[in-house]
Structure formats: structure tokens, C-alpha cells
């Protein structure tokens, strides 16, 4: 039995862009102006190169064997290609979202860092995560009774099911209720205290994901969580985005009255090779994110394949920060 899917047209909003249409103005040879997307990519014979104003002065490249899909949804450009070294690759608006080789690191950590930190989570909300990888990981927890998921872009869901079946296997779980719509609006309409955990699997704070990094969104998350409930959100790279991380930490310390922590992990195909997570809990039962208390019963989720990255040791290690980041993040506690 597959996941239930509903379409919430009242939750759907048009693609929003930053100033100047979310674009960089480029000058052509004849002097005319043209626009490039805020995140853009190029293919120079046989290579995909990822560039963005979020990491200026550098590019991240993979050798392309074959382009498998290229489309444009209401919200973003979607590309899937077969790479020479990382398997199939999903790209949104010119930015790599996952590869078959290293997706396990991100999906497992963003899911199990929060869910292994609280006893017996039953009801979970996933915002974003259209590829289905977080659903696959949430489903490993036998205590889960309901998984609500709100993804704004149905094309991402459909493309993942077609090209990344081992990732999108989470959609086959009958506990999943999929809503195609805007996660910001979905949370505003959620009943107060209705979730044990919220996982925000967003892209970078450009275009359709921008609101998922702002204070009103975090306030909606806190309202939707039960006392002692937890949230884990994608929180950028400490090598590239300390200014963004500072803002996220400040907002979360103001809004969440329980525990507030920053963790990070290695994902080779993400910019700088690492990605961070913000983990917070609401006021209520104490949550010690650094010491997992709810181990995964892998025997209950054999159909989802074995864990490839997460374990209890790497869980605790994820909260060990380099000195430069620790200094900045801890300063926000005051």
C-alpha cells in the first residue's frame, strides 16, 4: 500500500525570486543585458559545474556520462544526470541535491539525529524532502504511527520515483500522508502541539526555500511541536555560511526554549564537502541531542536497506565543532 497523496492548491504559491528576479545580470557580446539564475550551472564538454553567489569564486564539478532528465517546474529547474563517479545526480536550480553515492550521509543524519534523541516518536512532519530519502529513514523507527510530508514541487517527487527508486522507497510506506503544497502555509494550519518531530529538508535560502530560514517559519514549527518536541533543519556549511548560521542560531535561541544545538556531517558533493543541521527542542522534557537514547531497530526496516552512514558514535561526534565555529555559535547563547 503506497502513501496517500493530496494536493493542497490553497497551500501552493508561485515561484518567488530574490531582488532582480533572483538573477545575476550578465552582459552579452553586443552589450545587451541578460539574466542568469541566482544559482546556475554549466556543462562544458562532459562536465557539470555548479556555481552560486552563495559560494562565490569556486565551482563544483562532476563528469557527466548522460543527461537523463531536464525539466522546469513552476518553482525550479530540475535535472537528473548519470555521473562517472557518484551515480545518478539530482540537481535543482543548478545545485546538486543528492547523488546515489553519498545521499545516505545527509538523509540518515538529518533524520536520526532528532528521532534518536527522543523516546518513541509517533507523529512526524517532513517539510520539503521531495526525493523521499527522509521518508525512507523516518520509516525505520518502529514507533512511528504517522508521517505527514509537505513538498511544494510535485515534479521533484515524480522524478525521484522514476530515477531514484532506492531513495524514493519511503513513499511506499502506508504511514505517509503526502501533501503537495507550501510548507510555510501547511505549518500555519497545523494543530498546536501535534507533532513529536519536524524535519525541514530544504534547499538553500534562495527562491522557493527562502522562507524556511526565517523567524516566522521557526515560530510556526515551535507551535506545531508538543512540549519536548524536536526539530531538525538543514543549516548550511560552516565553511561558507557562518553569517547565515549565526542568524539561524539567534532565531532559534529566541524561539525554542528547550535545547538548541548545531551539528554537521560530511557530504562530498555538497559545497565545501560538509552540511550542517540545527537541532532544537521546545520547552518540556529535557532533550540531550548529543547522546542518543532511542536506537534504531534495523530488523523492523529491512526493506529500506541497511544503514550506510549513521551510528551512535557518529551521532555524538556530529556536535563536536571546530574552534572558529564553536566560538561564534556559543556567543549566540548570551
From Swiss-Prot:
GO terms for molecular function: spermidine synthase activity. Residues 45-282 form the PABS domain. Disulfide bonds: none annotated. The keyword Coiled coil does not apply. It catalyses: S-adenosyl 3-(methylsulfanyl)propylamine + putrescine = S-methyl-5'-thioadenosine + spermidine + H(+). The lineage of its organism: Eukaryota, Viridiplantae, Streptophyta, Embryophyta, Tracheophyta. Homotetramer and heterodimer. Component of a multiprotein complex. Interacts with SPMS and SPDSYN2. Residues 1-16 have a biased composition (Basic and acidic residues). This is Spermidine synthase 1. SUPFAM superfamilies: S-adenosyl-L-methionine-dependent methyltransferases. Belongs to the spermidine/spermine synthase family. It holds the Pfam family Spermine_synt_N. Putrescine binds at residues 106, 201-204, 270. Transmembrane segments: none annotated. Its EC number is 2.5.1.16. InterPro entries: PABS (IPR030374), PABS_CS (IPR030373), SAM-dependent_MTases_sf (IPR029063), Spermi_synthase (IPR001045), Spermi_synthase_euk (IPR030668), Spermidine_synt_N (IPR035246), Spermidine_synt_N_sf (IPR037163). Keywords: Polyamine biosynthesis, Spermidine biosynthesis, Transferase. The keyword Transferase applies. Pathway: Amine and polyamine biosynthesis; spermidine biosynthesis; spermidine from putrescine: step 1/1. S-adenosyl 3-(methylsulfanyl)propylamine binds at residues 76, 107, 131, 151, 182-183, 201. Residues 1-35 are annotated as: Disordered. GO terms for biological process: spermidine biosynthetic process. The active site is at 201 (proton acceptor).
Amino acid at each position: 500500500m503506497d502513501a496517500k497523496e493530496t494536493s493542497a492548491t490553497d497551500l501552493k504559491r508561485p515561484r518567488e525570486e530574490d531582488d532582480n528576479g533572483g538573477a545575476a545580470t550578465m552582459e552579452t557580446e553586443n552589450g545587451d543585458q541578460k539574466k542568469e539564475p541566482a544559482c546556475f550551472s554549466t556543462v562544458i564538454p562532459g562536465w557539470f559545474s555548479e556555481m552560486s553567489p552563495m559560494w562565490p569564486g569556486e565551482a563544483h564539478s562532476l563528469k557527466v556520462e548522460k543527461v537523463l532528465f531536464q525539466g522546469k517546474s513552476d518553482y525550479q529547474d530540475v535535472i537528473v544526470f548519470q555521473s562517472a563517479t557518484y551515480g545518478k545526480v539530482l540537481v535543482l536550480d543548478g545545485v546538486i541535491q543528492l547523488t546515489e553515492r553519498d545521499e545516505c550521509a545527509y538523509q540518515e543524519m538529518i533524520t536520526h539525529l532528532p528521532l534518536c534523541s527522543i523516546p518513541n516518536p509517533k507523529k512526524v512532519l517532513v517539510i520539503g524532502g521531495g526525493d523521499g530519502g527522509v521518508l525512507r529513514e523516518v520509516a525505520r523507527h518502529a514507533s512511528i504511527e504517522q508521517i505527514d510530508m509537505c513538498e511544494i514541487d510535485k515534479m521533484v517527487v515524480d522524478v525521484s520515483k522514476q530515477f531514484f527508486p532506492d531513495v524514493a522507497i519511503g513513499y511506499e510506506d502506508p504511514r505517509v500522508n503526502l501533501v503537495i503544497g507550501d510548507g510555510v502555509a501547511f505549518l500555519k494550519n497545523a494543530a498546536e502541539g501535534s507533532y513529536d518531530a519536524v524535519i525541514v529538508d530544504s534547499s538553500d535560502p534562495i527562491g522557493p526555500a527562502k522562507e524556511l530560514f526565517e523567524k516566522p517559519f521557526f515560530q510556526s514549527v515551535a507551535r506545531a511541536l508538543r512540549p519536548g518536541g524536536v526539530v531538525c533543519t538543514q543549516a548550511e556549511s560552516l565553511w561558507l555560511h557562518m553569517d547565515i548560521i549565526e542568524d539561524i542560531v539567534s532565531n532559534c535561541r529566541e524561539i525554542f526554549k528547550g535545547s538548541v544545538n548545531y551539528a554537521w556531517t560530511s557530504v562530498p558533493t555538497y559545497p565545501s564537502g560538509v552540511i550542517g543541521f540545527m537541532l532544537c527542542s521546545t520547552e518540556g522534557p529535557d532533550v540531550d541531542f548529543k547522546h542518543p537514547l532511542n536506537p534504531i531497530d534495523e530488523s523492523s526496516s529491512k526493506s529500506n536497506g541497511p544503514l550506510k552512514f549513521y551510528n551512535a558514535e557518529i551521532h555524538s561526534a556530529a556536535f563536536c565543532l571546530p574552534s572558529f565555529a564553536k566560538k561564534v555559535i556559543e556567543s549566540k547563547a548570551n
